[in-house]
Design a protein with these regions (language model features):
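Sec/Tat signal peptide C-region and signal peptidase I cleavage site
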Residues: 2-9
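A generic secondary-structure boundary signal that marks alpha-helix termini
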Residues: 5, 75, 98-102
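Flexible coil segments in periplasmic/lumen-exposed cytochrome c-class electron-transfer proteins
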Residues: 10-33, 43, 83-134
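Short, solvent-exposed linear motifs at loop/edge-of-secondary-structure regions
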Residues: 1, 62-65
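Periplasmic/extracellular electron-transfer cofactor-ligation site
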Residues: 33-61, 79, 96-101
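C-type cytochrome heme c attachment motif
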Residues: 40-52, 67-71, 75-76, 87-91
Length: 134
């Protein structure tokens, strides 16, 4: 049994292992109250299946990347992430990336097509508007 767990641990993508080694919390004290509430949903739901450090330190930053990630988690059996909590998690991750990972967002947007950039910026603005943050 121990060997099976060891083999499973070895099968984890090295990139993901690197994310898992980073910080597992975010200081959201300066975030809008609604973002702080969504962070609580993120921490409660996402920690059931994996370390919080994984999404916190990942190279996902754009809204479409977070949308794919959250939908993948929602489809996992027993995840407990329904559409309501999934939207809160998505909104938080998009907002957090636009603040904490701004340089990464900017670098990715610089490589995007004009249409992709406009779509991503509109989604980021929508989340900022929801949270009442400019």
């Amino acid at each position: 049994m121990i060997g099976a767990g060891f083999a499973l641990a070895q099968a984890v993508d090295p990139r993901i292992q690197q994310y898992d080694k980073g910080p597992a919390t975010i200081n959201v004290s300066g975030y809008p109250a609604a973002a702080q509430q969504d962070y609580a949903v993120f921490t409660q739901k996402c920690s059931q299946c994996h370390k919080l450090s994984r999404p916190i330190n990942s190279d996902f930053a754009l809204p479409d990347e977070w949308s794919r990630y959250v939908h993948r988690m929602m489809s996992k059996p027993g995840s407990g992430v329904d559409s309501s909590s999934g939207l809160k998690i998505y909104d938080f991750l998009v907002y957090d990336s636009s603040v904490r990972k701004k340089a990464m967002v900017d670098a990715k947007l610089a490589k995007a097509s004009p249409a992709e950039k406009a779509a991503a910026e509109a989604k980021i603005k929508q989340v900022h508007d929801k949270y009442g943050h400019q």
